[in-house]
Amino acid sequence: RTSKNNFYVLEDNLRVPSGSSYMIENRSTMMHMFPELFTKYNVKNVYDYPDLLQKSLIKCYSNFSHSPNLAVLTPGVYNSAYFEHSFLADEMGVNLLEWRDLIIDNNKVVIKTTKGKEIIDILYRRIDDDYLDPLTFNPDSLIGLPGLFDVYRSGNIMLANAPGTGIADDKAVYSYIPEIIKFYLDEKPILKNVKTWRCSEKNSLKYVLNNLEKLVIKEVHGSGGYGMLIGPTSSKSEIKKFREKLISRPDDYIAQPTIALSTVPILTEKGIFPRHVDLRPFALMSPNEIHVTNGGLTRVALKKNSLLVNSSQGGGTKDTWIID
C-alpha cells in the first residue's frame, strides 16, 4: 500500500509460495497474548488454511476411482522453510517426505511403509522445478527424485504446483500481466502493477542506466531480496557495479520506481518507530473455485529506512486481521 486505498501488486509467486504457516503462528501468538481483543472484535479465522489447502489439492486430482493419497515433498531439514513443510504436513495429517523416502515402481511414485508399499497420488511439492528430478532438470540436484517427471508426464501422479507455473513468478512476465488480463478476460486489473522497465529493450535500458540512483533493479529470476539494487539507498560503488551487470546482461534485469511502502509501528529497544511493510495474501485455486485467505502474512522491514521485508534479509512478520 502506498497511500489510503491505493494498493499495488509487487510480484506474483506461483511456484512454491511460502509463509502460510507463519501467518497461522502469528495469529496463535496474538491470541495467546491478547485474547480480549479477539473477544471484542470479530476477527476472521485463518486456522482453516491447511484444511482448505488439502481440499483444494484433492479437488485438482482428476482420477476419481479412489480417494487420493496426498503427501508433502520437502528438500529436507536444511531448507529455510522446512518448519512450514512440517507444519502443513502435520496439520493436513499427511506424510512429509524427502526424495529418499520414495521410489519409482511400475511408473508410479511409491513410499515403503511398515504395512508395505503405498502409491502416492498427489505431491504438494516444495522444491523448485530445477531440482525436482535430476534426470530431467538439473543433473546436479541432490534433493529431487530421479524419474519423477516421467511419472508426472504419464499422468500417474499430480504435482502441485505444476512444473512450469514458475513462469508467472518471472519479473519480466509480471510487466505484461495487465495486458494478459485484458487479452484473456477482457477486463482491467482491479489492482495496479508497478511501472516496470524491461532492460532487454534498448530504450528502457537507456533510461534505467541514466536513472539508477532513483530506481529499484531486480533480477528477472531473483527472489528473497537477493540480486537487487535499491538506488536511493545504495553507494556510488554499488551503483557502479550494478551498471556493469546491466550493460553485460541486460536481459536478466527489470527496473521499477522506488515505491514508498506504507509503514506500521514496531517496538524496538529504543522505543516505537515506523517500519515499511508489504502484504502477502494466499490464494488457493481448484477447478471450480478460488479461495483467498481471511488474512495473510504482513512482512515488515525491521531495519530503519529499509524497504527489504524478506525474512532472508532480516525482515519480520505481523499478524494480519480482517474484521467482519
What does each of the following model-derived ranges do?
Residues 1-324:
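Domain-scale recognition of functional cores that engage charged ligands
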